[in-house]
Amino acid sequence: MVTRLLLATCNARKLDELRRILAASGVDGLQVLGLADVPEFPQAPETEPTFEGNALAKARDAAAATGLPAVADDSGLVVDALGGMPGVLSARWAGRHGDDVANLRLVLDQLTDVPEARRGAAFVCAAALVLPAGREQVVLGEWRGALVREPRGVNGFGYDPIFVPEGEQRTAAELDPSEKDAVSHRGRALRALLPALRAVCGLPGALPGALPG
């Protein structure tokens, strides 16, 4: 039996990454759909003050509108020297949603006088799974590192070109996709949802109490 799962995102690069992570997870019986595969519906605005709140709002709307189990994520960059910002505002930090170059340049400008020892940061991802019947689960993944002064690399998206993960010399944008998926905030969050996804598919390996039970 195949279970259809909706990944509720309009970001094509994020959708590719989510699909890639799920494909490598070994959960059989999932047909992964994107928003382009279902009728259009009004999507929740990202107005919650937390990553978890935004992820849940998007997944709830998607599950209610389509009748499908839905996974949504909200993620962003948390910069120590900026008091945790841009945080949930990461995608629109420079004012326009999804302008990766402007967002990245603004963060670098704000950190111009910050020394290397204080350029710590983390990528954070909240991933939410919501079933049409109303059951839901939300998990967090975090990826710590530091910010360099100039972008490097052509892979990834968002702030990847300025983020060097702990234990690495390369930026996230210099990692191969499979390398990034194995350690990234989004990879960690989705892997934390695997017991619930296995339960949705009726597969062994679901934890007691995982969705749907």
Q: How would you name each of these model-derived features?
A:
Residues 2-6, 12-213:
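Anionic-ligand binding patches
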